[in-house]
Amino acid sequence: MRTDLFDFDLPQGAIALRPASPRDAARMLVVEASGALHDRVVSELPEWLRPGDALVVNDTKVIAAQLTGRRIGRDTEPKIDATLIKRLDGSRWQALVKPAKKLLPGDIVRFGHDGRVCLLGQLDATVEAKGEAGEIILAFTLHGPVLDQAIAELGAPPLPPYIASKRAPDDRDAADYQTMFAANEGAVAAPTAGLHFTKALEQALAARGVTLHRVTLHVGAGTFLPVKTEDTAEHKMHAEWGCLSRETADALNAARAADGRIVAVGTTSLRLLESAAGDDGRLAPFADDTAIFITPGYRFKAVDVLMTNFHLPRSTLFMLVSAFAGLDTMQRAYAHAIKSGYRFYSYGDACLLFRNPS
């Protein structure tokens, strides 16, 4: 499909720079399978679900992936900003760096340059390899949990570029940019639909008879990237690692067999479930990378309802929601949201989409 079909104009003032407080006070645009639109708030989510429905959340935890350091060992020591994007093993990470032109394979970057050191000492990394788009492989001198601790002490929350370009990360973001379900470290972006949940909402869902299930998909930085090709078929999707346990797969299969609906909280949960589903819709255990790219025409196998935020134009995520609810419906829903003052992107409001069977 033509990529420009997924374009739209968004006023800069519609981009949320802070989350709603409390979290479940965010607005929620309900989009029924018929295309009908309803303006609601997240705390009303239980009213739109049924006893026996199964809610699936992503329990990935965002790491402090934004690091600042200096190149050492040469005549000059330029400042280097690095964003960790994918763990390769116990000591090696793929990262995006700026300015990339200042680094060559073999260079050493020392993080925590402004007098900041972690409790375990300074954090050094060698540039092991360099790609054409500014991505590099960093081989750190520390390993495993010790490296994780050093990154946590020296790093900052990796806010999306549309927020970071307007303000610097602060102490509030350390909590705000983490869901209440966060347990398994590895994401460099939050599964933002999960940011809307509170203990009160969780209790209300349980009282409604909706069961809660956890999966893990470590969200990568590629989630923010627009599709730059003119045709969606030419786009290369980024891969992210995810895990669906046998216990959770069995529970979700049982819920569906009893006429319950699978409600994915976030596109990350949906992409993992669709990756783990067979043609008959049954879920199997999954622990692997997924690069599933969902565009209109895709036949959904595992998910019946999707709760998600409002996404960027020309993004793979707007293409996904257009596949789920229909492109015409989502264009109309987004136009309504913009006109009605909904807040967009990671810290913004939510949509609740009921799958269009056609």
Curated annotation (Swiss-Prot):
<keyword id="KW-0949">S-adenosyl-L-methionine</keyword>
<dbReference type="GO" id="GO:0008616">
    <property type="term" value="P:queuosine biosynthetic process"/>
</dbReference>
<dbReference type="InterPro" id="IPR042118">
    <property type="entry name" value="QueA_dom1"/>
</dbReference>
<comment type="pathway">
    <text>tRNA modification; tRNA-queuosine biosynthesis.</text>
</comment>
<dbReference type="InterPro" id="IPR036100">
    <property type="entry name" value="QueA_sf"/>
</dbReference>
<dbReference type="Pfam" id="PF02547">
    <property type="entry name" value="Queuosine_synth"/>
</dbReference>
<comment type="subunit">
    <text>Monomer.</text>
</comment>
<dbReference type="InterPro" id="IPR042119">
    <property type="entry name" value="QueA_dom2"/>
</dbReference>
<dbReference type="GO" id="GO:0005737">
    <property type="term" value="C:cytoplasm"/>
</dbReference>
<keyword id="KW-0671">Queuosine biosynthesis</keyword>
<dbReference type="GO" id="GO:0051075">
    <property type="term" value="F:S-adenosylmethionine:tRNA ribosyltransferase-isomerase activity"/>
</dbReference>
<keyword id="KW-0963">Cytoplasm</keyword>
<dbReference type="GO" id="GO:0002099">
    <property type="term" value="P:tRNA wobble guanine modification"/>
</dbReference>
<comment type="similarity">
    <text>Belongs to the QueA family.</text>
</comment>
<keyword id="KW-0808">Transferase</keyword>
<protein>
    <recommendedName>
        <fullName>S-adenosylmethionine:tRNA ribosyltransferase-isomerase</fullName>
        <ecNumber>2.4.99.17</ecNumber>
    </recommendedName>
</protein>
<comment type="function">
    <text>Transfers and isomerizes the ribose moiety from AdoMet to the 7-aminomethyl group of 7-deazaguanine (preQ1-tRNA) to give epoxyqueuosine (oQ-tRNA).</text>
</comment>
<dbReference type="InterPro" id="IPR003699">
    <property type="entry name" value="QueA"/>
</dbReference>
